[in-house]
Amino acid sequence: VGDLDDPRVPPACRDWLRECETMTAHNTELEFAIAFNYGGRAELLRAMTLAAAGETDVSQLSENDFRKYLYCPEMPDIDLLVRTSSEQRLSNYFPWHTAYSEFVYTDTLWPDFLGAHFYSAVAEYQTRKRRKGGKAVTES
């Protein structure tokens, strides 16, 4: 996920990433995304530019219509985002896909993030009452 056509990306790196995409294009068991040269604002700006140049009347554009112009339109919304290194910000990371995400913050640095940390984050996520923008349901 990102702008591989950016001239600042070394050609050998670009070729290797595209080869990896081709080699894994028909895999169906796991979805795995690498954010490389990715910026959320750049993705949204690109999507808006493509939508405006497209056949759809932008005043009638739905979320599903707009999604078609994102880098990975088939990528589902992110349910859980684990932010390592104690940073509590998105840092321009997938603004469209994280609109209703749950966040878990950890002081653990990414290179030190192990399976136990992952399971702990998932366990915390499982305690959440997800509303996806809706009001909290009060129990009577």
What are these regions, as identified by a protein language model?
Residues V1-S140:
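Flexible, compositionally biased loop and terminal segments
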